[in-house]
Regions:
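N-terminal catalytic or cofactor-binding beta/alpha core of small enzyme domains
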Residues: 1-209
Length: 209
C-alpha cells in the first residue's frame, strides 16, 4: 500500500524524534500528515511540495492543505527557534528522518546519515563530532555525512538557515536506514541509544549542554 511505503512516510522518524526530545528535555514538534498529501519538508513552490496524488487537485484544495497542515507545523518550529535565538541561546535543531535501504535499484551504503550545510562551520563540526562519537559507542555502524542526500538541499533546515544567523541556528537532519527500523528489536533500540549517547558527547565537546 502506497501510504505504508517510504513514499508515504518515514518509518521510525517519530520514534527517534521522541527519544531525542525525552533524552535532552527538548521541545518536540511533530506531524503525522503523509507527504502524499503535502510534504512539510519542502518549500512553497517546490515541484515536490505536492505528490502525484495531490498535485492535480484544484488550487483551492491545495491551498487548504497548506493552511491546515503545512503552515502550522512550519510556524511552530520557526517560533521555537526564534524564541531561543532571542534569548541569546544557540538552537540545535535535529530534524528526524529515515531513508529506504534501496532506491531505483541501488543499495544505500549507510546505516546513519548526518546532513548539514558544508558552509556552516558549526553544523560541520557538530556532525564530525557526532560521527566520531558514534564510532566509539557503536563502531559497527556505517555513518556517513551528507548521505544519502545533500544537507544543503531544499528543506526546513535550509529555510531556517536563511532566517537565522549561523552562530545562533544549527540545523542537522538525521537520517536512519529503514532496514534497521523495520527489523525492530534490539538493534533498533540500540541504535537509538547510541545516537543519543553520541550526540550528548558531541554536544558537550561542542560547548552545548
Amino acid at each position: 500500500m502506497l501510504l505504508d511505503s517510504h513514499r508515504g512516510y518515514d518509518p521510525g522518524a517519530l520514534v527517534m524524534a521522541r527519544a531525542l526530545a525525552r533524552a535532552f528535555r527538548a521541545p518536540l514538534v511533530t506531524s503525522t500528515i503523509s507527504r502524499l498529501l503535502v510534504d512539510l519538508n519542502r518549500s512553497i513552490g517546490h515541484p515536490q511540495l505536492f505528490s502525484a496524488a495531490t498535485r492535480g487537485a484544484p488550487a483551492r484544495l491545495r491551498a487548504k492543505m497548506v493552511e491546515q497542515h503545512y503552515r502550522p507545523y512550519r510556524v511552530q518550529v520557526e517560533r521555537l527557534v526564534r524564541q531561543s535565538v532571542s534569548r541569546g541561546q544557540r538552537m540545535i535543531h535535529i530534524s528526524s528522518h529515515s531513508f529506504t535501504p534501496e532506491l531505483d535499484g541501488k543499495l544505500r551504503c549507510a546505516d546513519v546519515g548526518l546532513l548539514y550545510h558544508p558552509g556552516r562551520h558549526e553544523e560541520a563540526e557538530l556532525c564530525a563530532r557526532w560521527k566520531a562519537s558514534l564510532a566509539v559507542f557503536a563502531p559497527q555502524l556505517r555513518v556517513r555525512r551528507n548521505y544519502p542526500y545533500a544537507g544543503k538541499g531544499d528543506g526546513l533546515t535550509s529555510h531556517l538557515r536563511r532566517r537565522f544567523p549561523r552562530g545562533a541556528y544549527v540545523g542537522i537532519e538525521l537520517e536512519v536506514n529503514q532496514r534497521i527500523v523495520l527489523a525492530a528489536g534490539r538493534r533498533w533500540t540500540a541504535l537509538r541509544g547510541a545516537l543519543i549517547d553520541a550526540l550528548r558527547t558531541a554536544g558537550a565537546a561542542h560547548g552545548d549542554p
